[in-house]
Structures are given as C-alpha cells and as structure tokens.
Amino acid sequence: MDKIIKEDALQIASSNYVDWRKLRGKTVLIAGANGYVPQFFVHGLLKRNEIRGDGIKVIALCRDRQKAEERFGAYFKREDFQLLQQDVCAPIDINRKPDFIIHAASPAGIKVTMEHPEEVFRANVTGCENLLKMAAENGARLLYMSSVDVYGMLDEKRWISEEDIGTLNHVGLRSIYAASKRAAETLCMCFEQKGADAVIVRPSQIMGPGIALHDERLHINMISQMMRGNQIVLKGDGTPRRSFIYITDAITGMLAVLTRADKGAIYNICTELGEATVRELAEKLAGLVKDRKIKIVYNMETRHSDPAVRRVVSTVCPRSQKLRGLGWESKVTFTRACQRMMQYYGLEV
C-alpha cells in the first residue's frame, strides 16, 4: 500500500471525532468499497483494529474482484475482512448480520452519467432500497453517501445549509446523478416507517490519493494535465467557487455522523477552509511544482453559453456548522491537501 494512503488510514483510525465505542466488535458493510472514497472506510476501520484491537468486522461489497485485489489484497487473509463480490442492485445475501451499512456504491461523473444513465440511477435508488431493507431487517444503521449535487440550481448565495434546496431538471441526462441522489434520500425517509435507521451525508469535492488519473474530478483533471505537460487549461475564466475537503477529514466526518448523529439526520461534509475558486485551485497546484513553470490557460470558448447556468453554478460552497456541532473539526488545510495529492502522484512539492 502507498505511503500516503497508509498515513491517511492511520489518521482516520486515530480520530477522536468518531465514537469508536459504538463500532467496537460490530460488523460494517461498505457497499461500493472499490470506489476512491469508500476504500478509505475499509482502510481506516481495519487500521483501527490494528492499533486499538476494536474487533470491527469489515464486509467490502463490490463488483470488480480484480480491482478489489489491487485495493485490498493485503487484507484477504485477515479474519476481520470479507469481500462480497456482487452488484448492489441485486438482492444482498450475506451470512453475517451487519450492524452498520454504508451505501457508497454509485458511478460518478458527467461522462458515465451521459453514457450509462440507468446504471447510475439504479445504483443509487435500487441499491439504496436493497440496503435499506437489510438495515430494517437487521436493526442496522445505514449511512447514505449522497452529494452536494442534490441542492440543484440555487440563487447566488455564499453558503449552502442542509435546509436549502434548488431547482433540478429531473428529466435531463446531466441531472440523472443528482436526481437519483435526491430519490435515494427520499427512500431513506420512507423506510423509517419500516424501522430503518438512516442518516445522510452530502460531501463536497473530496481530495486525496488513490484516484485514477482519468477521473473527471476537477483537481485530478488539473494534475493529469500537469503530468502530461506544462500547462493547465481551464474551461472558462476560473471564477466559480467550490468547496474542497481532504479525504481524512471527509471520512472522519462521515464516521462521526454514522456514530453520533440522530436518526434521519442530514449533514454536509465540507470545510469552509477548503473554499477556493477554480483559478485559485489551479494556481495552488501549479505553484507546488518545483523546477518547472506551469502555465494556466483560460479557454473561454468552452464556457457554458447560457448566462443563467453560469450564474447559478458559480458558487457551490456548503456550510459545515451542523457537522461541527457533533464535535468534528477539519484538520487538513487546503494547501496541505494539495501537497499530499501532488506527492502521491509523484509531482515534486
């Protein structure tokens, strides 16, 4: 396992923001475990067993065994780890009762959404239904990993709270991801009547190691460009503001919600310290590269032609006030998050 990932797993396992007493000796099912973000639930929980002997049983549900071997091969012979290879949309049958379920199984990105909209929708909605049924039957708590995309198009405002809601074109292909996340959130509320205990998290853009360079995430696209050459090409003028959070802060925040939040609660997973414009992100990453100058190019021809769309998506910065009410605080600065990513991808810092 990479050094950066090992260090991040240790940070998660050592966090005081998680109520580890509730996880001690329990079974945690992680759906979509192969994904960039959910893999860190696996790493963090198993590292906790190593340093504190908490006896947490981790079941990693994923479709691709080869990818799972690459991510978790070192755990395959451990008694506290079980690989469950299957589609989350199929009925889930396991021989061990889960105490906690984390639903993080969902393709993400504009390209995959446009090419495979039904797969994206079903992973969120059908997958969530299957896991909610399991939660209700076993008296387990489910954490649904939603997205800040559910807020849709909001009038220009500085911060987004959990109570805000914007418009969303639910029949547009580009909106399938957000629409399916909204639908799954509604399912979580519906299943409360059947005894399901569900909590929802809405992460902002999560930065960290272990993301494939072909990923569509904004910061990964920039790093990929720098690895191929000496420039970053931005679509537009770089003025839209976004909220970024490092993986260790995101995972500890979500585990805090899993172990401390009230039933049915919804939390943004973000930090105001990670707010930056697209231009500021590009300048920060470019400035961390030593021994060569990275040029930032603004391609105005690719800017969205609709002024209304440009306006409503210019700021996507959720508030963390509610999450901080659980005792959580961000520990990784925006600069440090960028540095660790650059180190992971072999760019000099």
What is each PLM-predicted segment?
Residues I4, Q82, M226-V349:
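C-terminal substrate-binding subdomain of Rossmann-fold SDR/epimerase-dehydratase oxidoreductases
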Residues F121, N169, L173-R182, E216-R217, ...:
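Short-chain dehydrogenase/reductase
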Residues Q85-A123:
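NAD(P)H-binding glycine-rich loop region in Rossmannoid oxidoreductase-like domains
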Residues M1-F100:
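N-terminal Rossmann/SDR dinucleotide-binding element
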Residues E129-R174:
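Conserved Rossmann-fold NAD(P)-dependent oxidoreductase catalytic core, especially the SDR/UDP-sugar
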Residues V171-V199, M227:
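Active-site Tyr-X1-5-Lys
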Residues V150-G152, S175-I176, V199-R217:
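Flexible, glycine-rich beta-alpha linker
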Residues F100, E115-N130, V171, S175, ...:
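Glycine-rich NAD(P)-binding loop of the Rossmann-fold in SDR/ketoreductase-type enzymes
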